[in-house]
Amino acid sequence: MTEEVNPKAFPLADAQLTAKIMNLLQQALNYNQLRKGANEATKTLNRGLADIVVLAGDAEPIEILLHLPLLCEDKNVPYVFVRSKQALGRACGVSRPIVACSVTTNEGSQLKSQITSIQQEIERLLV
C-alpha cells in the first residue's frame, strides 16, 4: 500500500533533513506559524508570508501540487519534498495525510534560527 515517491519530486530531503523538518513543523504548529494544505501554502506564498514550503513526494497525482515549486521559485522561497504525506500529516498535528504545508514568517520568533538553518540545507540540495 506504500506509494512510491514520484521522480518529479525534486529536491527530495534525506532521512536526516526530513527529521529536522518534521521537528520544525511540530514547533511551528505550537507557535501558530504553520499553514496546512496546498491551498493554504499557495495563499501564504502569494501574500509573501511563507519561509519554507514542504511538499509530499508521494502525493497522488503529483500534479496537484506541482504549481507550488514554480510559485516558490518566483517568490524566492525554499521548498523541499519529503517522502511521506502520512508523516507530513502527523508532523502537522493532523490525523489525515497532508500533501503540502508552509512555515510562515513571524518577527521575533524563536524559530528564526532553525528556519534559517533548514533553508540553507534545502539550498544545498539544489546545488
UniProtKB/Swiss-Prot annotation:
Provide the protein's localization: Nucleus, Nucleolus
Kindly indicate whether the keyword Ribonucleoprotein belongs to this entry: yes
Q: Which GO terms describe its biological process?
A: maturation of SSU-rRNA; mRNA splicing, via spliceosome; muscle tissue morphogenesis; positive regulation of translation; post-transcriptional regulation of gene expression
The family database entries (InterPro entries) matched by this protein are listed as:
eL8/uL1-like (IPR050257), H/ACA_rnp_Nhp2-like (IPR002415), Ribosomal_eL30-like_sf (IPR029064), Ribosomal_eL8-like_CS (IPR004037), Ribosomal_eL8/eL30/eS12/Gad45 (IPR004038), Ribosomal_eL8/Nhp2 (IPR018492)
Coarsely, its chief localization is: nucleus
SUPFAM superfamilies, alphabetically?
L30e-like (SSF55315)
Which key words tag this protein in UniProt? mRNA processing, mRNA splicing, Nucleus, Ribonucleoprotein, RNA-binding, Spliceosome
Give me the Gene Ontology terms describing cellular component: box C/D methylation guide snoRNP complex; nucleolus; precatalytic spliceosome; small nuclear ribonucleoprotein complex; small-subunit processome; U4/U6 x U5 tri-snRNP complex
Which GO molecular function entries does the Swiss-Prot or TrEMBL record give?
RNA binding
**What's the superkingdom here?**
Eukaryota
Q: Which Pfam families match?
A: Ribosomal_L7Ae (PF01248)
Would you identify the family this protein belongs to, as annotated?
A: Belongs to the eukaryotic ribosomal protein eL8 family.
Function according to Swiss-Prot or TrEMBL: Binds to the 5'-stem-loop of U4 snRNA and may play a role in the late stage of spliceosome assembly. The protein undergoes a conformational change upon RNA-binding.
**Name this protein carries in UniProt:** NHP2-like protein 1 homolog
Organism annotation: Drosophila melanogaster (Fruit fly)
Query: In the UniProt record, what gene is named as encoding this protein?
Result: hoip
